[in-house]
């Protein structure tokens, strides 16, 4: 006979929020509370299971629990890895990892005039480097990675809302993001496509002032040899990927499309790709142009 606690656990969803110090864990916790998650901040990994058991015994139940976990301690890191594997046997568990570029984290710590928890007698960058190395394994096994480097607290809260607010109405939340390779790969991309095989409108003086959002550039990009074949082939490759995401309950995916500067080709291809993805069932598609206007 299955107990009520076990039955409730199978229906329960647990989100573990972790990541780099200064990357926005408190902001994420507040955003999740606004979405009616039951949030516990600074929870030691050893307390995850007792928390879930207590939640299951609550009269009304707590179907969505978010635990903000600090794993900077070496023992805490090992404990969290083991606890996640154990919990996944009877509970739906996902890990949200927050990160940001070193220069961003240094600036944030300097703004609040606080030392990094791991810097000791070293510099801020020493502490950040040590923490990044310690968290590498948990980052690689995370279900969702959000790079907060270019986000203020309001934009981060919006991003979390975009990821989690409509989960009951669509199986996979898909973000299609254009970017410029010269500014670096998006750290939170699940899939990356390279549009640099297409001729660059930048070298056409009449198109240079415009962007991939403008019809004249978009038409120029999409009519190039190989553009349509690429989009159709990529969509065909994405179908089994999204089917697998749905089977594995992966609710969020970021597809990054890059060109040299993130102004022409990647923007046009990303817009077209997003438009066609919206016709597929079980997807909620949004679009972001990371580097547009940056030049």
Swiss-Prot record:
Positions contributing to ATP binding: 19-26
Domain of life according to the entry: Bacteria
Residue sites binding GTP per the record: 70-73
Keywords noted in UniProt: ATP-binding, GTP-binding, Nucleotide-binding
Cysteine disulfide links: none
Keyword Nucleotide-binding in record: yes
GO molecular function annotation: ATP binding; GTP binding
UniProt entry tagged with the keyword Signal: no
Family: Belongs to the RapZ-like family.
Functional description taken from the UniProt entry: Displays ATPase and GTPase activities.
Protein name, as recorded: Nucleotide-binding protein Lxx11490
Organism of origin: Leifsonia xyli subsp. xyli (strain CTCB07)
């Amino acid at each position: 006979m299955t107990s009520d606690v076990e039955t409730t656990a199978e229906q329960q969803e647990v989100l573990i929020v972790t990541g780099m110090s200064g990357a926005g864990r408190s902001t994420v916790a507040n955003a999740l509370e606004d979405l009616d998650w039951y949030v516990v901040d600074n929870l030691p990994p050893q307390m995850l299971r007792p928390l879930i058991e207590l939640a299951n015994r609550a009269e009304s139940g707590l179907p969505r629990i978010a635990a903000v976990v600090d794993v900077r301690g070496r023992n805490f890191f090992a404990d969290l890895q083991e606890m996640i594997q154990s919990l996944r046997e009877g509970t739906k568990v996902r890990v949200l990892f927050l990160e940001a570029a070193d220069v961003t984290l240094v600036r944030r710590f300097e703004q609040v005039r606080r030392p990094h928890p791991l810097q000791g007698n070293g510099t801020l960058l020493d502490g950040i480097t040590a923490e990044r190395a310690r968290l590498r394994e948990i980052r690689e096994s995370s279900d969702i990675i959000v790079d907060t480097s270019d986000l203020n607290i309001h934009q981060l809260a919006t991003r979390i809302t975009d990821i989690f607010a409509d989960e009951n109405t669509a199986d996979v939340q898909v973000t299609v993001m254009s970017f410029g390779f010269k500014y670096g790969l998006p750290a939170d991309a699940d899939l990356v496509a390279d549009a640099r095989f297409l001729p660059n409108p930048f070298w056409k003086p009449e198109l240079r002032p415009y962007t991939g959002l403008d019809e004249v550039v978009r038409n120029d990009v999409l009519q190039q040899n190989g553009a349509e074949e690429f989009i159709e082939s990529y969509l065909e490759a994405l179908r089994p990927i999204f089917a697998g995401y749905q089977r594995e309950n992966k609710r969020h995916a970021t597809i990054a499309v890059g060109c040299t500067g993130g102004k022409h080709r990647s923007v046009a291809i990303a817009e077209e790709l997003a438009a066609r993805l919206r016709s597929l069932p079980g997807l909620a598609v949004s679009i972001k142009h990371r580097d547009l206007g940056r030049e």
